[in-house]
Amino acid sequence: MAKQSMKAREVKRVALAEKYFAKRAELKAIISDVNASDEDRWNAVLKLQTLPRDSSPSRQRNRCRQTGRPHAFLRKFGLSRIKVREAAMRGEIPGLKKASW
């Protein structure tokens, strides 16, 4: 189980990313615009740097919904491999069965 503080930190990162998404997209558009002046582009870079670090979506980590485990996360289920296996063995995931050949 992940610490509660780590889970809370991830929730905070998701909220910050949503809050600053439009502002970040606007600044990135200015930075990548070749027709914008160098001064405008540089000012956009400086403004982007003043935004909170955790507002960047790349700072988010996928975690298991049940345990908060950050490694071996399966996106399709939103769970770690361990919890997917446990749920599959109990028959809780429709259409998923143990491989046999």
From Swiss-Prot:
GO cellular component terms, alphabetically, are: cytoplasm; small ribosomal subunit
List the lineage, top down.
Bacteria, Pseudomonadati, Pseudomonadota, Gammaproteobacteria, Enterobacterales
Domain of life from the UniProt record: Bacteria
Similarity comment text for this entry: Belongs to the universal ribosomal protein uS14 family.
Q: Where is the signal peptide?
A: none
Which Gene Ontology terms describe the biological processes this protein takes part in? Answer: translation
Return the Gene3D superfamilies for the record. Answer: 1.10.287.1480
Pfam families reported in the protein's UniProt record:
Ribosomal_S14
The function of this protein is: Binds 16S rRNA, required for the assembly of 30S particles and may also be responsible for determining the conformation of the 16S rRNA at the A site.
Assembly, in brief, is: Part of the 30S ribosomal subunit. Contacts proteins S3 and S10.
Give the GO molecular function terms: rRNA binding; structural constituent of ribosome
Q: Matching InterPro entries, A to Z?
A: Ribosomal_uS14, Ribosomal_uS14_bac/plastid, Ribosomal_uS14_CS
- What is the official name of this protein in its record? Small ribosomal subunit protein uS14
Alphabetically sorted, this entry's keywords are: Ribonucleoprotein, Ribosomal protein, RNA-binding, rRNA-binding
Q: Which HAMAP family match?
A: Ribosomal_uS14_1 (MF_00537)
